[in-house]
């Protein structure tokens, strides 16, 4: 019964979208940024992120502080495709009674945006690649370098021309926070 209800709700929503967005040009959604983002705009997001192993650490009698990550991107389309390019940096802390870790990560990112109704919404998907410096008393030399890569799918909702909130799901972490547009 629950599956039938979910299917009916999905059908109603999918068929009602064109009614609520009758003035929306669906043929242009793949080649335009959402939420009024334009070529040359700069986006800065500050987020709290939960890595995939966050609860494994907690369940192993450990402690963890969610990652704090800042992303900076510039809107730079390729041909007609609405991409943003930039970088990210973050820090996190975790451990247990025997050891502690501090991870510092940094790298580059490329994100593809899609415009959908309503006009305040920006949908996107991206790739990130960089390096993670894992500093711990568990290692002989105190530090390890690891690749830091991932993918995500997310959405931003802008309350004004320059401020919004975002949520992102992906690997190796999912995150939520605020985004500023300059």
Question: What does each model-found stretch correspond to?
Answer:
Residues 22-44, 49-182:
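Outer-membrane beta-barrel transmembrane domain signature
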